[in-house]
Amino acid sequence: MSVVGLDVGSQSCYIAVARAGGIETIANEFSDRCTPSVISFGSKNRTIGVAAKNQQITHANNTVSSFKRFHGRAFNDPFIQKEKENLSYDLVPMKNGGVGIKVMYMDEEHFFSVEQITAMLLTKLKETAENNLKKPVTDCVISVPSFFTDAERRSVLDAAQIVGLNCLRLMNDMTAVALNYGIYKQDLPNAEEKPRVVVFVDMGHSSFQVSACAFNKGKLKVLGTAFDPFLGGKNFDEKLVEHFCAEFKTKYKLDAKSKIRALLRLHQECEKLKKLMSSNSTDLPLNIECFMNDKDVSGKMNRSQFEELCAELLQKIEVPLHSLMAQTQLKAEDVSAIEIVGGATRIPAVKERIAKFFGKDVSTTLNADEAVARGCALQCAILSPAFKVREFSVTDAVPFPISLVWNHDSEETEGVHEVFSRNHAAPFSKVLTFLRRGPFELEAFYSDPQGVPYPEAKIGRFVVQNVSAQKDGEKSRVKVKVRVNTHGIFTISTASMVEKVPTEEEDGSSLEADMECPNQRPTESSDVDKNIQQDNSEAGTQPQVQTDGQQTSQSPPSPELTSEESKTPDADKANEKKVDQPPEAKKPKIKVVNVELPVEANLVWQLGRDLLNMYIETEGKMIMQDKLEKERNDAKNAVEECVYEFRDKLCGPYEKFICEQEHEKFLRLLTETEDWLYEEGEDQAKQAYIDKLEELMKMGTPVKVRFQEAEERPKVLEELGQRLQHYAKIAADFRGKDEKYNHIDESEMKKVEKSVNEVMEWMNNVMNAQAKRSLDQDPVVRTHEIRAKVKELNNVCEPVVTQPKPKIESPKLERTPNGPNIDKKEDLEGKNNLGAEAPHQNGECHPNEKGSVNMDLD
């Protein structure tokens, strides 16, 4: 079973996997751990990752990047309309109102949703992980920004489902970083001690996130989070781009914004310049050749100028930090450490601002680029049964307060209740109780729309169906279980109605059966309490909310004893006495039955099942097309490689191994094949290249074999000659009565001599025949035949010549005057045997126990 953590960023992605030795960040086919979040579409296939980024400038209109923030948003979203102006590709509205991306693929115009584009990127990451692990990848944990709303999170889950990934958890970036930090720490305070508070700061390509976490041994709790979704390294790049656009317009009369390719080149160079200024404070040049209209441009900037240019952005850094400290009510002295991650935190001015705010130096003990992916892989290992990981519980926080609104049964007014406050523990479940006579609706929304970086405050509408009044006309008691799950998504998981069913007592046996019902059928309230205890154990608390109209309570309600449980012991004794008496009349008896109710969810920007299936089918077809195109290109490259290899060697090492007539014919075929490759064969089917390769190999293979045989034959013949000399010398020593071989039987040695003579005769004949042939003729014997003779010779001779000499027993000593005969050898052997038995007498056997793979986390 695979354990994979995926950090899917706006600019780049990282993949971490769990192995027996710990967590490892893996590299792609370019030996790079960083895979760009770029997808390029061509006339035959898709290109994803490094190869796509390399052609981003030349295929700007069909290369998609920076699409992560489009998840779960409508096309008319203000953020989408603003970002649309800065993109090299076109955005279009989809049929469901979402964001679509228009590209030319397979020479046709296609419209892909954001979920499909992300699924393509996940396909590449999945393929990279499978190539590294050498096994299929299904289970994974994917990172998302902590400020992602329900709609955005569901959109990411749909993308994972399209590519066939089972996302065990959508993990917040900062929570993943905290897990990667805390699980390796050996000096954390005990559970009963004051926790260690650490602040994590992450500035990536497009966003800025901070969180405060409390650590104890074996657990972490997120105290609070804050963020600026529109502040990242990209904004610093844009400041440089704006500066140099204005400079080039004045200096060279060139408008870089008028041509998308020129603007993309300037973006790339400004990003490089920003990274250089992080380590150099001197003036640094920026040079671009043939920028526009065949003109070269140049400029320069130093760190102080850059910081002055970005002063407005640097001031924004403190806003989320102030927000975090206010939410958590922490002081600077309460914070033990400040850990920074993310590529943009390498900017010296960013580090200085963070350090100045807290009044202490920042720490860089974590890998700034890979910390999120490693944390996701650790979480996946914790959730996977295939790995045994140190016990470590993770309690996340709800980033935005969530409320429910509903209509009263008999009034026009609405009831509102905040079920999850800001920074409430998650995952978490609560139960709300309603008194209703019919189906009713609940609408979930974010209580503070101004604090949510998303235009729609509504989460979804939930309809609790099949609710009916009791048979006596009273309102039914409906219990609704609301939950923020492991993905950070709000949902109404279950709803149940407490139904009172009257029964009649007919005889003593029926009464006795009814009296046993409490043991066989627990009441609904006790069942709910059990569920809540199980669900809330993840967060460590067990609150229960009972809501009736506008009345709310944070304490568990006392169950209404309307069934058999309301009987007192005295009443039970009275009933027992009445069993022996004839029944006076049939008495009604109330049973309490739990009825599960269906809940219909209408969520914001949720992909339908049919649309999702269509996307899955489309992705499968594109994967197959990419595979076929790769095989076709590999076949074409094999033909081209074959042409160059034989042409080069026919004028070199292969020249002696082909006759002049065949040489000219082969060279002519190579030239014709090369011309065909760059003309008619530029775009042919895979089979056409296979046929061409077979035609070339038909002429080239015999030449190649002659060369290889000529190279290897002398070495193999020399080995055979050495073995013959070795066995011939042993036979001669035997005939000379050498003591080393006098134990060998005469008949056995004759077999050796016969085999040596036969093989020697065969070798001489072969060498004489081969000497008469020229190099351009096929050899008389192949090297594999000579190796077979060596093996045959060894099989006959080696068992004979390596026979051990028989052991000679030492004579027994005569009786000595002081005692009986003593066989010293036997006595010695006895002592040795006695000593050898001692370990067996005292030793113990402990069989190895097979278990889960242990991960080395120390």
UniProtKB/Swiss-Prot annotation:
Q: Name one GO cellular component term.
A: cytoplasm
What is a GO molecular function of this protein? Answer: ATP-dependent protein folding chaperone
Listed Gene3D superfamilies = 1.20.1270.10, 3.30.30.30, 3.30.420.40, Actin, Chain A, domain 4 (3.90.640.10), Substrate Binding Domain Of DNAk, Chain A, domain 1 (2.60.34.10)
- Positions where Phosphoserine occurs in the chain: 509-510, 558, 810
Chain positions found as N6-acetyllysine: 471
This chain is encoded by the gene named Hsph1
Polar residues composition bias: residue spans: 533-549
Q: What other facts are recorded? A: There is sufficient sequence similarity to other members of the heat shock protein 70 family that some polyclonal antibodies raised against the HSPH1 protein may recognize other epitopes and so expression studies should be interpreted with caution. Some papers report high level expression in testis (at protein level). However, others do not detect expression in testis (at transcript level).
Q: Which positions bear N-acetylserine?
A: 2
Domain of life of the organism encoding this protein: Eukaryota
Q: What induces it?
A: By heat shock.
Q: Which family does it belong to?
A: Belongs to the heat shock protein 70 family.
Where, per the database record, does this protein carry Phosphothreonine?
562, 816
Main function: Acts as a nucleotide-exchange factor (NEF) for chaperone proteins HSPA1A and HSPA1B, promoting the release of ADP from HSPA1A/B thereby triggering client/substrate protein release. Prevents the aggregation of denatured proteins in cells under severe stress, on which the ATP levels decrease markedly. Inhibits HSPA8/HSC70 ATPase and chaperone activities.
Query: Keyword set for this entry?
Result: Acetylation, ATP-binding, Cytoplasm, Nucleotide-binding, Nucleus, Phosphoprotein, Stress response
Q: One Pfam family this chain carries?
A: HSP70
- UniProt protein name: Heat shock protein 105 kDa
**What tissue expression does the UniProt record report for this protein?**
Expressed in neurons in the cerebrum and Purkinje cells in the cerebellum (at protein level). Expressed in testis and no expression or only low-level expression in liver, spleen, lung, and kidney (at protein level). Highly expressed in the brain and moderately expressed in lung, heart, thymus, spleen, liver, and small intestine.
The leader peptide range reads none
According to its UniProt record, where is this protein located? Cytoplasm; Nucleus
Describe its assembly. Interacts with HSPA8/HSC70. Interacts with HSPA1A (via NBD) and HSPA1B (via NBD).
